[in-house]
Design a protein with these regions (language model features):
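RNase H-like, Mg2+-dependent phosphodiesterase core
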Residues: 1-202
């Protein structure tokens, strides 16, 4: 009987030729009021099936952490990168997202020839890309990248919680919860808040 997870590997099976490396790419942190955007790129070995792999947003934190270790140990190559709050402000979130995706890809060895990317917007990667709508749920390489990006960014925001405990970053990871907005009204923004994201508060 075929593993149910194998459905996520259709792109990998179709594209695999044993000689052309390709990666899945995804990001975490486009929407939060605070913190960087993080991207990851992952090249999985041909034939690998990772039980339980799915879009990081559909997984518990405990499951993401377990998958993070499996992906890092199993991947042929992976890259993880950030774009800072300052870069988000200077480039807008779309530009900053592609910046960090390109940084993640550039960190990989062997270098991928093309990428599988979630979404359907214009490709602004430095390599050719195949766009996959809902790719983080449908494509194993993209799902693996989504896990690495999400876990890495969440851990960063946990560290920021120790520096700025009044905002509760460990709980909401910078997203606009009621408690986060209440803390902003009481304490004002921290150095890691995104000014353009806070304009609607005024």
């Amino acid at each position: 009987m075929e593993h149910p997870e194998m459905d996520m590997y259709a792109y990998e099976r179709f594209l695999a030729d044993g000689k052309t490396p390709f990666c899945g790419v995804d990001e975490a942190g486009r929407g939060p009021l605070a913190g960087p955007v993080c991207a990851a790129a992952v090249l999985l070995p041909e034939g690998l099936v990772i039980p339980g792999l799915n879009d990081s947003k559909k997984l518990t934190a405990k499951k993401r952490d377990a998958l993070y270790d499996i992906i890092c140990e199993s991947a042929v190559a992976f890259g993880i990168a950030f774009a800072t709050v300052e870069e988000i402000e200077a480039l807008n979130i779309k530009g900053a997202t592609y910046l960090t995706m390109n940084r993640a890809i550039a960190d990989m060895e062997p270098a991928p020839v093309f990428a599988l990317v979630d979404g359907n917007d214009k490709n602004e990667l430095d390599i050719p890309a195949i766009k996959v709508v809902k790719g983080d749920s449908l494509c194993a390489s993209i799902a693996a990248a989504s896990v690495l990006a999400k876990v890495t960014r969440d851990r960063y925001m946990d560290d920021m919680d120790a520096l700025y405990p009044q905002y509760g970053f460990a709980r909401h990871k910078g997203y606009g919860t009621a408690a986060h907005y209440a803390a902003l009204r009481e304490y004002g923004p921290s150095p890691i808040h995104r000014p353009t994201y806070l304009r609607k508060m005024h």
